[in-house]
Curated annotation (Swiss-Prot):
A zinc finger (RING-type) spans 41-82. Residues 448-470, 478-487 have a biased composition (Acidic residues). SMART domains: RING (SM00184). Keywords: Metal-binding, Zinc, Zinc-finger. Residues 1-28 have a biased composition (Polar residues). It comes from the Eukaryota. Gene3D superfamilies: Zinc/RING finger domain, C3HC4 (zinc finger). One of its GO terms (molecular function) is zinc ion binding. Residues 1-36, 390-411, 431-515 are annotated as: Disordered. InterPro entries: RNF141-like, Znf_C3HC4_RING-type, Znf_RING, Znf_RING/FYVE/PHD, Znf_RING_CS. It holds the Pfam family zf-C3HC4. This is Uncharacterized RING finger protein C32D5.10.
Length: 610
């Protein structure tokens, strides 16, 4: 079995309890120092993590920061006072690590900014989110201060101002991190920062793991190299406690929340105690038997279950890699949660809109396969179903086809129907047909006269006023109306004249029938069904000439021609010669003539040759 990496110098064997005892036995002067604000590292400008002091000047820095400074800096000098450095010493240990040992162990290689595209996108995306949150907090503060009861809301204003300060602090850390990326800082130094690692637990980033970290570390191997793993875990856990988001967070409003506080902020100075618990748990059980419930108890239940699971995954990846903390940070790869693909999947990274803060719920369970389907915001906009996510078959963003429903695309226009037959000859209209009974049976039970120029929509008209108006009438075709003389079946536009002495039926007393009906379909749809012969030659041309001659509007020509036809029929001096098979037109009643004239005007057969 391969031995663990020796990039970190062997430390003197010391138990984790020694760290706790050294902190418990403090002088009064050290207690006063606890009350003072914690110093910041002059290299990273953040709170010192894994405090390490220099040999001669005793200035303190982060362990990772001073190691990177001594290896890639101008020389073994203090970053603050330029005093030569012969060795460094971690707080809580007696081991002195010389500069020669640090250089022999290897330094994190500087990385070009173009090689950290993903890391830069991760940080830049979080910076934009911080700026949006600050603007939102400013709007809420302004709205709360302008209210009349602002004194009662003073605690809320103080809470909002505190959240704004925390957001500004996080924004400054992220901007410095992005500046380091632009200036070619090593990937290990970027990924090991608490400002970057907290993005992993805020559901912004997903770890793609290491290809050589699949074999779990056994308890025997862990105990044989306990000094190495003690130093590795201490460096890792010191950073992670400042990265894990606390379970309870203040809310900006009723809809939005933000990770303001970490486990370090709410642990009340119990970081070393938590580190001791986790180290003892790994020493007793190994990495295979780590239980989320027990790890949560070791973290004092201050983080959510989701964060605990992500923390265990990172912890196992580090230990199973058998690398130091910096080496592991330089080797592991991360991607934005909304991206699909990656080098580990054999694909190019497919990026989507960075404004999406969280991954959609339907994609969160699909992490078993390394070949992720492409997901874009257009799938939801255009109504695509997400069932394909469970079948493993990506679906196009747009659903095209005859049965597709697209809210952004109008329905196709209906195909226009063919032109109907021109009309019915006069001889057929005035001749009794043997098929009148069958035509009558095909007709509707009620026949409605429709006038397009009537303005009395939905208004009830008295019977006396209806005779002088154009209100549609409804006639019944029931067997009780035995005096029927003329029947118009307008559903298929077929007119049938009967030579029996029957009068028109009375209008049906029906409130719904008294209301005017509108054409639901174009008139050509009715003309297609009419069983007619060709009109006399030139009749339609004469009607067109009349329309052009008097410059009739096309929308009102039908009504004007109906009135003209009615007046022309009344003024007829000589009646038309009647036959034995057709009734005398001169004997028609005015209502019968109006019915006939209405039909003629609709079919275009209006003009009568003298």
């Amino acid at each position: 079995m391969d031995s663990p990496s020796t990039s970190e110098s062997p430390l003197k064997k010391n138990t984790i309890q020694d760290f706790g005892e050294s902190n418990m036995t403090e002088s009064p002067q050290s207690k006063e120092e606890i009350d003072e604000p914690e110093e910041e590292c002059s290299v990273c400008k953040n709170e010192i993590i894994d405090t390490t002091s220099l040999s001669d000047c005793c200035h303190e820095f982060c362990y990772d920061c001073i190691v990177g400074w001594l290896t890639k800096g101008s020389g073994p000098f203090c970053p603050m006072c330029k005093t030569p450095v012969s060795f460094i010493q971690r707080k809580g240990t007696d081991e002195k690590i010389t500069v020669q040992q640090i250089k022999s162990e290897g330094e994190p290689a500087a990385t070009a900014s173009e090689d950290l595209v993903t890391e830069k996108r991760i940080v830049s995306r979080k910076i934009r989110s911080c700026r949006r949150l600050m603007n939102q907090i400013d709007e809420i503060i302004g709205a709360t201060s302008s209210r009349s009861d602002s004194q009662k809301r003073k605690p809320r204003l103080e809470e909002l101002n505190s959240m704004k300060q925390l957001c500004v602090s996080q924004l400054n850390s992220l901007q410095m991190l992005r500046d380091d990326i632009d200036h070619g800082a090593a990937k290990a130094l970027i990924v090991s920062k608490a400002a970057f690692r907290r993005l992993i637990y805020e559901r912004q980033v997903i770890s793609e793991g290491l290809p050589d970290a699949t074999n779990s570390l056994s308890k025997t191997e862990f105990r044989d190299n306990i000094d190495h793993y003690r130093a590795v875990l201490h460096s890792f856990l010191s950073v992670e406690l400042k990265s894990l988001p606390a379970k309870t967070q203040p809310r900006v409003d009723n809809e939005n929340s933000w990770y303001f506080y970490t486990l370090h902020d709410v642990a009340e100075g119990k970081d070393e105690e938590i580190i001791n618990r986790i180290f003892s748990m790994i020493e007793d059980r190994g990495t295979r038997d780590l239980n989320a419930r027990e790890v949560d108890a070791a973290l004092n239940g201050l983080v959510s279950c989701r964060v605990v699971i992500a923390f265990i995954a990172e912890l196992k990846s580090l230990i199973n890699s058998r690398k130091s903390f910096l080496e592991w940070c330089g080797a592991i790869t991360y991607r934005i949660r909304t991206d699909r693909g990656g080098e580990s999947a054999g694909n190019d990274v497919v990026t989507v809109d960075d404004s999406i803060e969280l991954e959609p719920e339907e994609n969160r369970s699909n992490h078993r396969s390394r070949r992720f389907p492409v997901f874009t915001p257009f799938d939801r906009v255009f109504g695509s179903t997400m069932g394909h996510m469970y079948r493993g078959q990506p679906q196009a963003p747009l659903r095209l086809g005859p049965n597709a429903t697209n809210p952004f695309r109008p329905a196709p226009l209906p195909v226009p129907s063919q032109l109907p037959i021109a009309g019915i000859p006069w001889a057929e209209l005035t001749t009794s047909s043997a098929g009148a009974g069958s035509a009558r049976s095909r007709g509707s039970d009620s026949v409605v006269e429709i006038d397009d120029d009537d303005d009395n929509d939905g208004v009830d008209v008295d019977d006396d006023d209806r005779e002088d108006s154009d209100e549609p009438r409804t006639y019944s075709n029931s067997e009780e109306d035995s005096d029927e003389e003329i029947q118009v079946v307008e559903r298929d536009d077929t007119i049938i004249l009967d030579d029996s002495n029957r009068s028109l039926p009375k209008p049906v007393a029906n409130g719904s029938a008294d209301r005017k009906r509108k054409y639901e379909f174009p008139l050509e749809d009715h003309w297609k069904k009419a069983k007619t012969s060709q009109l006399p030659e030139g009749l339609v041309d004469d009607v067109q000439e009349l329309i052009a001659k008097y410059n009739m509007p096309l929308t009102q020509s039908m009504n004007m021609l109906v009135g003209a036809a009615q007046e022309a029929i009344i003024r007829i001096n000589k009646p038309m010669p009647s036959t034995s098979s057709a009734p005398d037109i001169s004997k028609f009643k005015p209502d019968d003539m109006l019915q006939l004239a209405s039909y003629l005007s609709r079919t275009g057969a209006l003009s009568r040759r003298q």
